[in-house]
Amino acid sequence: MAKVLVNGNIKSGDVLKEVIENEPHLENSNIAIIRGIKKETEKESKKYKITTTKGVMIVGITENNESVDFWNKNYSLLEGKNLRWKSPLDVAFGAITIDLDVVKEPYKFKKYDVALSISGFDKTEGHLIFIKKDATEAQGLRNPKIGELIGGKRILPKLTTEDKIISIEPIMESREKIDYLLTTDLNTKLEDDWKIFTYCEAELEGPSKAVEHVLAIMESGYIEASEHTNTYIADCRLQTLKMDEENLKDRDRGTITVRNIGEGIGKVFVYKENRTSSLSHTAVGKITKGMELLDFSEGGIITTISTPERLTVIGKTNEEAKKLFEKYGINHTMEGAPNDIIIEQTPKYTMDILKSKEVITKGIPENKIIKIEIYDEKAPVSAWYFRKMTGLTTQKVGSLPINFKHGDMVMFDKNEEYAKGLLPENIPNEETGCPEGVIAITNMAKRYKGYIGIRLSSNDKFGPTGESFEGTNIVGKVVENGEIIKKLRAKDRVYFLEVNQ
């Protein structure tokens, strides 16, 4: 029987499922196991400490070229060399012989680049130069840049021709190499001293709407690693939802942000490495436990517990909401019967409720809400459009006002921006026609793309929006309480509750 550490707790067992019992963990979510840590020292230095008579400068090697090869073998030749010149563009130490091919091609430099230079295209006039401003210049080498000045930038403007390089030392860094396993296999056999992580904790704080966006994702109990890089993982489930709030903070390791503009708007990011603040990212919180799971996950889902938990109760009964609010000491005013389904609440967002300590919920009888099934697999683009139009992206009850009724069709309005990209998918079968209760959207094959409709009776020629079948995307169907629609008029609001079939 192996002795291991699970989420910081000592456990014993032969296989994984024995030691994660009673630990937070969703079925099929990722589990990270650290089997050991080794220290490795770099074979070649990526940083150099250059000591001058004015102070110390640190150069970070960023390139992989013949100039870097020469530098790594010959940097000591520059020890004791004076500052040869100082210009608005650069400062140079030398001279030494640089036995590399001489070329006259210009090179595009950025401020604080560090390079080798052959002055006058004479190999015996080789120098180490520090770039002071962006410029395009010929330095006598095809690839002159070796790296960037990453430390001691304040020294650069102080240097004069009386200064020299005292010493150059490579900085050899040791890095930890982690032997880890990411698994969902609960029959994994264990060994002593393994560290196991089954979940992460998130503390959320920031603009109310942005925090609610993240809570809507975490309400399901997990973060999805839809995308991953060395810098972050991103959950893309609510991508394209508008986010108009800003909260500018440095994106330190563990920081949670929501993309608020441009490509990827609505994505939720968790940072694995430090990054500076960005106007396009709204900071909403931090992972406080279990970052190891995010470090190693290249896909799958990660069990997540958020603080606070979500207090948006639309879709719950008034009675269920009352119990939740009592837990947080929130004064709850209930409109409707205890068993009514909540369709509205004020304030809307969790953070605002926690601040005000008051909330009003409005419920209606369950038989006044149309229960529907949405075809995510058969019509994914149309399903996402329907969810965005109704609000079912982030809450359990959605709604739409009736635009007009005509015969056995009920029509709902469109959104031109959201309707872009509604290609034909899951169109009706000509043999079976369009059954009663079908929910459909007009696709891009027709002029009025984006309209949503429901058929109150079957039809073998036209879909719920009055279009022929090639212009009709079936997105779902009414499974209960469909008779409600027959009694409603234009501008009346229809409430939808999604149910799993």
Swiss-Prot record:
Q: Which domain of life is it from?
A: Archaea
Give the NCBIfam families listed for this entry.
methan_mark_3
Q: What is this protein called?
A: UPF0288 protein Maeo_0995
- Similarity comment: family membership: Belongs to the UPF0288 family.
* Organism of origin: Methanococcus aeolicus (strain ATCC BAA-1280 / DSM 17508 / OCM 812 / Nankai-3)
